[in-house]
Amino acid sequence: HLSVDNFTVKHDNQHIIVNGKASPSPEDSIVADLKDVDVAYILNLVNFHSVDFAGKATGKAIVKSLFNQPDAYAKLDINDFLFENGPLGVLHAFVNYNKVDEQIDIKAVADEDKGNQTIIDGYVSPKRNYIDLGITAVGTNMKFMESFCGSFMDNIEARASGKVNVVGDLSHINLVGDIEATGKMHMTQLNTEYHFEKLKAHAIPDDILLRNDTI
């Protein structure tokens, strides 16, 4: 077995503190206590760049049965959470390794001000090179859409409600689903800023259809 006693990495108010014992037994565990740890730094360590997440993570990550059939999970609060460079407030996430399907399951809620909220439920499978994150938007900041629509729009300042999925091969991720949005955006090819109210958007692989819009 492997024993870890208060292994600490610290910088200013940030820290990672690791304690516990790793063995084939499910009764033994390694616990990492995190405070204000840069999420982007963690993703760089594991070489995951298919989807951009950022923010400062605080919480605990636990690994059991490290030398047998590993079981890993984490409960984290992430301040200043960014999804594809779009701010979504504070993310409260439960992440666990699904041994049966060999994927990372994610259940999370991102809270912004004024009751705006984003609910995330899905998985990432490095083994199958696949992602499927269901997103329920309730007044969600749509800045993250620029990463999917950057070829024809930018400067998105809008909020939306509806359901979409970030889905597909990790080398070619798509957005599918339906939302209703109010705000403004800049159409790059026309060099024109559009304002819209209750714009209905239907996302399909590699395309977004706009319906019943008032501009």
Protein language model regions, located:
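Interface amphipathic segments
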Residues: 1-215
